[in-house]
Structure formats: C-alpha cells, structure tokens
Amino acid sequence: MAALTRALPAPLHTSTTEYEEAPAPLPTTPGPQLPKYGQRKGWKPKTAADFNGGGAYPECHVAQYPLDMGKKNKGQGSTLALQVDQDGLVRYDAIAQHGRAPGSRVQSSFKDLVPLANRTDVTESERQMERPDDLSVAETAERTRLALERITHGKIKAAQPKHVPKTNSDATYIRYTPANQSADEGKQRIIKMTEVQEDPLEPPRFKHKKIPRGPAEPPPPVLQSPPRAATAQDQKDWMIPPCISNWKNNKGYTIPLDKRLAADGRGLQDVHINDNFAKFSESLYIADRHIREEVRARAQLQQLLAQKQKTSKEEELRLLAQRAREDRSGLSSSVSGSVAAASASRLPAETGINLGGYGSESGSEEESDEEEEDEEAIRERNIVREEKRREREKEMRMSNMGSEMRAKMLAKEANRDISEKIALGLAKPSASKETLLDSRLFNREALSTGFASEDSYNLYDKPLFAGSSAAAAIYRPAGSSRNDESFGGGTEEGIKEEMSKDRFQLGNATRGFEGAEGVEAREGPVQFEKDTIVALDGSADPFGVEQFMDAARRGGKRTAEDRDEERRKRARDE
C-alpha cells in the first residue's frame, strides 16, 4: 500500500471534508392560542388555524367546518367593484355594462349622443366606417348558418323518439348443401333468410315468473339468560295506562278518578318539595307572632291611657259636682278651698272628717244620693250614645250598599209585622185568667173521635161548601180589582157579558159541545149524583156484582141491547 502511494503522482487538489451546517430554524409566527379541553366554554372556532389541522370540537355547539369540509361555496355575487376612469371619477356606467356579452358596446354617456363628425376624441380612421371585406362577410355568414342549424337540429331531435331499435331489413342468402348423399344426389340450394315482421301491439307470449326468495340465513347464536317470569313489580313498572282524554268522552263512560290521573303521567316522577317553602312559612309565622305581640302591647297601652284619661275625667267631674254642691249649700270660699285641698289629697269620705266642722250625717247621705243620680245619668247617656252609634253604623252600611240591596232592606223593614203594641208611659195590664178560656165552650158535649159512628156511611151526604156565597168565594179567581174588572168580576155572568160586548166576536165560540145548548147557567161547583145500582132483589149493589153474576149465568146469549151497544162501539171506533 505504501509502494502504491509513492508510485502515484501528487494530487493537484487537496480534498477536504466539508460538513454542511444545519440550516438555522426559520422564525415562525406563533399560531392562535387554543384553549385547553374543559376550558372551551363560549369559544367559537372560526378560522382553519383554530382547528390546528384536526377535526371539529364536539363540546362547542356551533357550526364548524374543519379544512372547509361541508362548507358551501358562495357563488359569484352581484356586487360590483368600484371603478374609476383616468381622471379619477367613479364610472357609474359599469352598472349598465354588467352582465353584457364581452365586446358589446353600451352607450351610457353623453358623448355617445354626439355625432362622430363633431367629436374630437375620435380619429379620422374611426370616423371612416369602411365596409367589411368579402372574407369577413363569408365567415360571419358561415357562423350564423352553423348556429341556426344547431338550433334546428336540437328541436328536431327533441321531437323524434329515442332508442328506436334498428331493423336489418336486408335479406341474407345462404348456399345449402345437404349432407345425406343418397341415390339421387343432393343438389345445392340457395336459401333466402329474412326477419319475421313482429306486431308491436301483440301481447307477450311468455310470462316471466319471479324466482321465490331463498331461505334466510340462520341467525347467529347469542348467549342469553333463560327466560324468567315477570314479577308483579315488573308488570306494574311496565304497565302503560290507557290514553284518556280530558276533553272528549264520546261514549259517555264513567272513568274513575285514579284511572284518569294515571293517564296524566303524574305518578311517573317524584315530587320534591323545596326546603325554602318550610323556611318561608316559618319566617311568616315568626313575623306574624311578633306583629301580634306588638299589636297586643299597643292595645294594652292604649287601654291603659284611656283608663287613665277616663279616671282623670271622672275625678274632674267629681270635683265639679262637689263644687256645685258646695255652692248650693252656701259654704264660704275658705271652706270650699279646704274641701278642694281635701279632695285633691283624695281623702275618702268614709273617714268621718267633716268639712270645716260643719258637716253632718244628713249631708253625707245627700251627697251619696247625688252621686248615685250622677252615675245613673252617666249610664243613661252611655246607652243613648251606643244606640246613636249603632244607628250611624247602620246608615253607613246602607249608604255603602247597592241600590238593589238597599231596596230589599227598605222593603224588609217596611213590611215588618209588629204583633205587640206598647203604650209608652202606661203600666203593662196584667192578663186575667178569664180571657184565656172561652166561656162559649162550657157545658158542651165533646165530639167523638171519628165525628160519627163506625157503621155509618154519611161522610159525603152533604155538600162540602153549602151556600152560594161560599162557592162564589172559592171559585172566584184571586187578583186585584183591576183584573176583576177586566174579566167581568170573575163570575160567569160577568164573563158572558164581556164576551157579548166583543166587537169582533173573538171570545164567542161558534160551535159548542154536543148536548150542552140547553144547559142552564150554573153557580158554584159541579154537583155530582151518586150512581146507585139496584140488584134484582131490590137491594143496593154499589159495585155491580149481582149484575156481573147474572150476565155470567146467562152465558153467551146476547140480547138486543147488547147488540145495539156493540154496534155503537164499532161505529165509534170507525
């Protein structure tokens, strides 16, 4: 190896191993700060950088399009970009040129109305409107012809039916040589083959039957627990109540209340009562108790103040009465002063101390009598005040009542029945025992319990209301005098008289009942006669038993009277 190295010439260029340096990292712009999982409440990803190359965030309930997947591309809008001309003015004619074919010219300015000969911005070559050459005319004509043919062929193809099968109507000639070489040599024949014409309206010759579906694959085996019977609790949990409407009941069935409530679904959820209701009720109770205690204390204080005021007023009245008595008795002013001082010190009168040595027992008795009279007068005044207060309260209630209620109260007070009359200022007469007994009933025989003997049958022997006056009073319609006058006094004669005065004869019947023309006028009630049936032996037969038995004995023999009766019944039925 060393000899080989010496034999080789020296290298012209020395090779040095160069190590490529690692490229410096390019400065990257920091991306958006994405919130961590669990802290994305209220955050909405809007740009593609928010997804960080991944998918959507399921915890953010907004429309998300990662990598623009599912995002609908917006079509070309109709909004025009603002354009200006070489002078910096806005080109409003861009609106008129929008949507036109390229190359079309729209006259949208005033200079388009000026003739070309008078315009300064048009060159001489543009003014000279040269005719097109023959080549351009031919090209335009060919382009127009092709466009018209395209439109025409499109309409023709639309009218022609599609998918029409092509029929090969050409005949086919076949040279046929029989294979059997019999005694008589077979001759070659030429056969002409053509397609048979088919009737397009011929029904199908063969019926296509659908192959029945094969058996399904057996289900895969699934390991499951053996079936077990449902318990009563399971049946109750799985029970679905029938649907019962709260508005319709066309059949009119009577549905129990528990079934109606079961269909409402109220028992499916447990009712949880908030504890704040109890706290609220307790606070209300405590507040009510405090308020009642305050009201009670305030009432006691007011009562105590009223009692003190009443005591002071009574003391003042007592002093005034005592001073008046002293003035009437003619005592001196010094004595009155001492009496006032003694009364101010509230010394009782029972101590026996006389007023200045001038008092006596007779004077104390007079004072006690006057005090009793004053108390009686005060009591009477209090009673009068209470009555007046009640009257004022009643008047106040009457004023607050409605008109209807006030009228009822007034009518009730006006129609009150006062059964006792009191003569004021007179002594009450004492009721004597003689007025309590009726002397007309003395020495009279009492009636029996049944008012008659048990074997007598004379209860209806006499009319109930004997006399025309009683009957007229009973059968007269009740009413005011005005009604009596309008209906002829309520009597039959008055009614007939009023009907006879009828101008249009509306109240008179043109035809009455048969057999009632000769009946005389009747006063009072209708009087009936007792129908007594007499038997053959002359005894009374009230129920017709003897007559019935007699007809039964005769049997089927009918008399002429029976035939007449039957004939009358038939005529009446017909």
Swiss-Prot record:
Q: State its location(s).
A: Nucleus
Keyword Chloroplast part of the UniProt annotation: no
Per the record, which residues fall in region Disordered? 1-46, 203-234, 350-406, 478-503, 549-574
Keywords, comma-separated and alphabetical: mRNA processing, mRNA splicing, Nucleus, Spliceosome
Assigned GO CC terms = spliceosomal complex
Q: Where is the composition biased (Pro residues)?
A: 24-33, 215-224
Q: Which Pfam families match?
A: SKIP_SNW
Q: Which GO terms describe its biological process?
A: mRNA splicing, via spliceosome
Q: How does it assemble?
A: Associated with the spliceosome.
Give the family, as the similarity comment puts it: Belongs to the SNW family.
Name of the protein this chain belongs to:
Pre-mRNA-processing protein 45
What is the species listed in this Swiss-Prot or TrEMBL entry? Cryptococcus neoformans var. neoformans serotype D (strain JEC21 / ATCC MYA-565) (Filobasidiella neoformans)
